[in-house]
Amino acid sequence: QKTAYAISACLVGSEMCIRDSSYADRIRRREPGDDSLGLSPHCDAGSVERWIDPSYQKIYNDIFADRFKNFNPFDAKFRDRTIEFESPAVAHVFRTFQGWTALTEQGPKDGTLQLIPITKAMAYVLTRALLEDVPENELCGSKVGKALSVNETYHSLLLEGLISIPKMYPGDTIWWHPDVIHAVEDKHLGIFFFIGIYV
């Protein structure tokens, strides 16, 4: 069950007030040996929208204009204006960062979170879909209403950078930019249950 509290602001007279907000996406609980709860490498917050939505086009303008070195992924100017296709599997809450908090001890090979810790990798993902070897209507496997797929067929070089997060203890947390590619290990090879919460 997802719980969301809307980010809200109000104007009272001439003063701006901002209300506290929080967002809990889901809890992940895996038992030793589980091989059913892995997630393939992806980015949340839309897939095909990144090429066709006017706000995403503004966000990625430097990438599409072949000035990818100038792309600033931390400029959030248009990120709260993107429009995603409706889907029960995709969160529609604007998040400046995504997070994972350990509720139990966990680490590599425990079926835990993986990242490609390169924020500007989005430049590779977006432009890769525009190369001649990719069918015009395919966008490297991106599908409406799904997360942005990062796969072996088109992104094998990028996937070499996929690493598991380090050993974490209850209360430890890790945060990543919404353009960072992430996954969950296919199998839990550890000996204890692990529980983590996405925030």
Language-model segments: which ranges?
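Single conserved hydrophobic/aromatic residue that forms the stacking wall/gate
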Residues: K2-I18
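Extended, Lys/Arg-enriched charged tracts that mediate electrostatic binding to polyanionic substrates
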Residues: S14, Y23-I83
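A short, structural micro-pattern
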Residues: S21, V93-R95, L189-I191
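Double-stranded beta-helix
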Residues: K58, D62-H177, I181
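A short hydrophobic beta-strand segment most commonly corresponding to one strand
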Residues: P117, G190-V199
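Acidic/His-leaning functional-site neighborhoods
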Residues: T127-L131, D186, G196
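Short beta-strand His + acidic residue motifs that chelate non-heme Fe in jelly-roll/DSBH
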Residues: H182-H188
